[in-house]
């Protein structure tokens, strides 16, 4: 889910800004796999929300953090970082795996939430799964072509659809519709029938 959440917005040459406080698997995804795909991840100390702003440039597509990072369990400043990002056209993607019952990041301004079903639902690593939730609270169109080109320019892989325009009649769901119609199609993940 974390990979899809980022890949839905960032391509080679783009970057995201991430908290340094991450689960080891996510850290390696960001430091190695995304790097190999040409997506730079800029790690910042999350105790100062301004660090996210200071690491941002014209190619920054998202901020990423964990609500209660594993193993530190320190509380991430969701509202502060979400506000910084929103003013710059950058969504905050939150991994809420450790606190699904305790915290509702969308209510604090996060735009996208991811969960590791492997950890929370399975618990022993015998199942693999992830979940992405689009909060429907981020104005992707207002973020614009320069900040969010993946959703504001024609997608040649889907008949030239401009996602923010294509889904307007059904609501602010361009982010999740693009994930379902492109990443699920291309990378072989399967949605549960239930």
Name what the model sees in each region.
Residues 1-194:
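Conserved PLP-enzyme active-site core in the AAT-like
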């Amino acid at each position: 889910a974390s990979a899809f959440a980022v890949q839905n917005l960032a391509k080679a040459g783009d970057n995201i800004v991430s908290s340094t406080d991450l689960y080891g698997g996510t850290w390696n995804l960001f430091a190695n796999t995304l790097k190999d795909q040409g997506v730079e991840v800029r790690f910042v100390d999350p105790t100062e929300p301004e660090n996210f702003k200071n690491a941002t440039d014209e190619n920054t597509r998202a901020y990423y953090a964990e609500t209660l990072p594993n193993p530190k369990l320190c509380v991430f400043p969701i509202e502060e970082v979400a506000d910084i990002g929103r003013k710059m056209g950058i969504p905050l993607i939150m991994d809420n795996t450790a606190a699904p019952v305790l915290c509702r990041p969308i209510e604090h301004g996060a735009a996208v939430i991811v969960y590791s079903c492997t950890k929370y639902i399975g618990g022993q690593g015998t199942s693999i799964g992830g979940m992405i939730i689009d909060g429907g609270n981020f104005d992707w169109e207002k973020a614009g072509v320069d900040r969010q080109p993946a959703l504001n320019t024609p997608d040649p892989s889907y008949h030239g659809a401009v996602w923010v325009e294509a889904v307007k009649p059904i609501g602010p769901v361009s982010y999740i519709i693009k994930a379902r119609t492109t990443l699920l199609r291309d990378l072989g993940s399967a949605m549960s029938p239930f």
